[in-house]
C-alpha cells in the first residue's frame, strides 16, 4: 500500500524535479525499498528546493509517519521550509 502512495506522490513532482532524479528515487519501489524511495525523493526535494504545497507537505508527513520515519531527522525536518506561503 505504501508503495502505491509513494508512486502517486512522486507523480506530483513530474516537471518540478528532474526526471533522472525522480525516476531514480521511485525506481526503488520496484525492489520493495519503499522507505529508501521516499527518503531519497525527499532528499532531492530538499536539495533542489522544490516548492511544496501544504497538501504535499502533509501527504509526505503522513506517509513518512506511516512508514516509521522519525520526522525530526533529515530530510524530513527540512521540508517545512519549502512550503509555498502565499
Per-region residue spans from a language model:
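C-terminal-biased regions
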Residues: 1-86
Amino acid at each position: 500500500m505504501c508503495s502505491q502512495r509513494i508512486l502517486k506522490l512522486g507523480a506530483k513532482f513530474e516537471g518540478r524535479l528532474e526526471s533522472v532524479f525522480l525516476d531514480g528515487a521511485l525506481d526503488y519501489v520496484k525492489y520493495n525499498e519503499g522507505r529508501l524511495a521516499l527518503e531519497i525523493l525527499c532528499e532531492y526535494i530538499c536539495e533542489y528546493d522544490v516548492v511544496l504545497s501544504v497538501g504535499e507537505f502533509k501527504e509526505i508527513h503522513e506517509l513518512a509517519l506511516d512508514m516509521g520515519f522519525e520526522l525530526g531527522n533529515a530530510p524530513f525536518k527540512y521540508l517545512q521550509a519549502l512550503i509555498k506561503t502565499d
